[in-house]
Regions:
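Conserved Radical SAM active-site core
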Residues: 7-14, 26-27, 33-117
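Short coil-to-beta-strand transition motifs
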Residues: 3-4
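A short beta-strand-turn-helix
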Residues: 15-20
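Conserved AdoMet/S-adenosylmethionine-binding subsite of the radical SAM
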Residues: 84-205
């Protein structure tokens, strides 16, 4: 874990949220380095090792978020890697003080929750199940689908979430089986929605 006043950062950028409930909205992304979850299909494996990525002061990240807010960003997304490998309380405090935008978290839920967030997207993994506190705290449950076992896993995870939690299935990128399974499940279960990686279709970050 880094010094709580500095965090290893892969990148920051202002783009559109490509996935989930808030897809299509302008957002400022802070991608933190470090992840031990190790999903085989991960499209940001370069973010796994915390070493090699520069540690940046949290106040500098908050200042960058404020610049993005002035340029039209409607919220901040803290992602990774696995951002909860780090203590996020100092970062969210700085963002609240300097930026004021709503704060969103994208996590697999394997670590305790830290920091204050307006929206939590939980994307649990079968090989590293999430903590119960994240299942209950999340606003959005998003499960990546590659095969039928992921549909069963999604149902099991949803049963542990609050009733008003958004439930989304996201086909694995270039997974025709996952796509067919997710579409059919959503068609038959009104409480689920389909999530697509629209940023990849658009060719943006």
């Amino acid at each position: 874990m880094a010094d709580s006043q500095r965090l290893p950062v892969v990148e920051t950028f202002h783009s559109l949220q490509g996935e989930g409930h808030h897809a299509g909205r302008s957002a400022f992304f802070i991608r933190l380095a470090g992840c031990t979850v190790g999903c085989p299909w991960c499209d940001t494996k370069h973010s796994w090792p915390a070493q090699g990525h520069p540690e940046q002061p949290i106040d500098a990240l908050a200042d960058a978020a404020q610049i993005a807010a002035e340029a039209g960003a409607s919220f901040v997304v803290i992602t990774g890697g696995e951002p909860l490998h780090h203590d996020l309380q100092p970062l969210t405090q700085s963002l609240d003080a300097r930026c004021g935008l709503p704060l969103h978290l994208e996590t697999s839920g394997v670590d305790p929750l830290s920091g204050r967030f307006d929206w939590i997207t939980l994307s649990p993994k079968r090989h590293r199940p999430p903590r119960q506190e994240l299942l209950q705290a999340c606003h959005e449950l998003k499960v990546v689908v590659h095969g039928p076992e992921d549909i069963s896993f999604a149902a099991a995870m949803a049963s542990k979430c609050e009733d008003d939690t958004e439930r989304l299935l996201q086909p694995g990128w270039e997974s025709s089986i996952g796509e067919a399974l997710a579409v059919e499940h959503v068609r038959q279960h009104a409480q689920w929605r389909l999530s697509l990686q629209s940023h990849k279709w658009l060719g943006i970050r």
